[in-house]
């Protein structure tokens, strides 16, 4: 298993680039040629870690073209961990491409007045690896623990 990259931002402001949406909320140049189960990994709608972070900023700041109520419901569904010190909102993703399992764990951690956005993407060439699914999350919590100076963030 290989950790590709972690993108984390220590800021609560929205300074990302512009994404363009049509009425449905999808990119105007939407291209589902990658297939319904892999368009986000390959094809015209593949998404980078930076785009994941930008989308998460817009979600957190209610800057998406959806009703505030709908966005708040999504944020509530995304709560992965809620403790007295912080809240993690996150989403997993998993797909296969070119013989590799590709796993995502994206979201953000809110702690007092600080916000940490993250996008973790890992790959494995071993099919049916029982450690793959939890590794997406475990790697991220290990890094967040270091960033927050805590031994056990999981």
Where are these regions (language model features)?
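Structured C-terminal helix/loop/strand segments within mature extracytoplasmic catalytic/sensor domains
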Residues: 44, 53-154
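Mid-domain, small-residue-enriched loop/turn segments at the edges of structured enzyme/sensor domains
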Residues: 1-61
